Amino acid sequence: MRVVNRTAVTITGAQPFVDWMRDTDADFNRGAITVPRAKAYGSAFLLPEFDLEEDLQEWVEDNVAWLFDFQLSAWTENEETWPENRDLATFREWFRIDIHSVVVDVADDDIEGEEL
């Protein structure tokens, strides 16, 4: 077990995102997805450690287009269903951002990943 020198940011869907999920998939239009259940469809990002929360907020602002597209593509890659307006204000309406300053890796094996 080790503390990792990263800041974790989790992004989960708020009501507008859940409504969009339902609209794009009829199987979920029956109430299977709610805001609390949408948490399972969230994402976690490991960022460099930031001394100030303002620096982290600036990172989100600088990367909002990529973050928004990433969240949408995790649900469907059909960009025709994506909202046209994907700016910072809309992102903040559609998603909840949680910051975790302490990240602990409890696994014994090395972290593996693929480049995006």
Feature-to-residue mapping (PLM):
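Extended, charge-biased low-complexity segments
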Residues: 1-50
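Amphipathic protein-protein interaction modules
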Residues: 46-113
